[in-house]
């Protein structure tokens, strides 16, 4: 009746993985956890809760999720992150859709993600809410369809699929819990910005000194006011700064990689130039002093 596989990617998530698995294990046939060589108790906890755990070295966000998706036996798959939890209302809604065999009326379902701040036991009024496809039929859509990025992990439909009117927004919500600590958020910002910078280089993006100078200001204002981090008070102020700093780091690292690439090219060109001069001088010497 269920015919759903859930997949989760993890890295040192011992503090949160149980909550995520417990929120999906009653509505899915299997829970696949693809772990990036955690050094804590993540793998043991996941196995104890009945998940199938596969240890896989890091392939990037898109690569890791694509691999996890491919490990699922069912066509219908549900993806959640280790820091997320389905509400009981959302669990009941998904269970009802599949129990009544109505899931194939649509190709994918969007889920509303409500941001919960560290330590919050209930949601705050006006808290940020994001919508994204997390439940879908992998015959028609996949994380693997994401191109030119290892970081922007999103479900993309196959090119030949007409998905207009085939995506349904579920009424229930899922909770997205923010970082476990400031240290964890800063570490994540550092790692994620490095991955993003590499993506930008692959895409041939150029850095701008003006954007570099204004990036933090713009993204702080966007996070604090437009994304409504102000709802979380001074803690939201701190998180907005970290978020903006991560965006700044992305461009700063792009600049660094671009300059390194230029220096390497310049160095190679100089070496080639010297070799050409040396070859030319040798030719002139041979022409001046021909063999007897």
UniProtKB/Swiss-Prot annotation:
Superkingdom assignment: Bacteria
GO molecular function list: glycosyltransferase activity
EC number: 2.4.-.-
Alphabetized SUPFAM superfamilies for the sequence: Nucleotide-diphospho-sugar transferases
Keyword Transferase in record: yes
CDD domains (alphabetical): Beta4Glucosyltransferase
Record carries keyword Lipid metabolism: no
Keywords noted in UniProt: Glycosyltransferase, Transferase
Protein family (similarity comment): Belongs to the glycosyltransferase 2 family. WaaE/KdtX subfamily.
Protein name (database record): Uncharacterized glycosyltransferase RT0209
Provenance organism: Rickettsia typhi (strain ATCC VR-144 / Wilmington)
């Amino acid at each position: 009746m269920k015919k759903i596989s859930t997949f989760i990617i993890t890295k040192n998530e011992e503090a949160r993985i149980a909550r995520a698995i417990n929120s999906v294990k009653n509505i899915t046939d299997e829970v696949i956890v693809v772990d990036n060589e955690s050094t804590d108790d993540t793998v043991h906890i996941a196995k104890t809760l009945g998940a199938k755990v596969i240890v896989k070295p890091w392939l990037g966000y898109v690569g890791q999720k694509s691999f996890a998706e491919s490990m699922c036996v069912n066509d219908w798959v549900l993806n959640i992150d280790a820091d997320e939890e389905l509400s009981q209302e959302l669990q009941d809604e998904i269970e009802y859709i599949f129990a009544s065999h109505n899931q194939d009326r649509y190709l994918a379902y969007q889920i509303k993600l409500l941001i919960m701040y560290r330590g919050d036991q209930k949601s705050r009024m006006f808290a940020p809410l994001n919508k994204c496809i997390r439940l879908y039929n992998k015959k028609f859509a996949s994380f693997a369809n994401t191109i030119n990025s290892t970081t922007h992990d999103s479900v993309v439909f196959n090119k030949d699929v007409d998905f207009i009117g085939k995506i349904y927004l579920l009424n229930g919500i899922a909770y997205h819990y923010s970082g476990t600590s400031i240290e964890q958020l800063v570490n994540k910002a550092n790692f994620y910005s490095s991955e993003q910078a590499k993506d930008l280089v692959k895409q041939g993006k150029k850095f701008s000194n003006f954007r570099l100078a204004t990036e933090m200001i713009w993204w702080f204002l966007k996070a604090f006011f437009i994304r409504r981090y102000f709802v979380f008070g001074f803690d939201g102020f701190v998180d907005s700064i970290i978020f903006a700093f991560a965006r700044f780091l992305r461009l700063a690292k792009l600049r660094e990689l671009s300059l390194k690439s230029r220096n390497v090219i310049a160095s190679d060109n100089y070496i080639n130039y010297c070799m050409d001069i040396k070859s030319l001088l040798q030719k002139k010497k041979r022409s001046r002093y021909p063999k007897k």
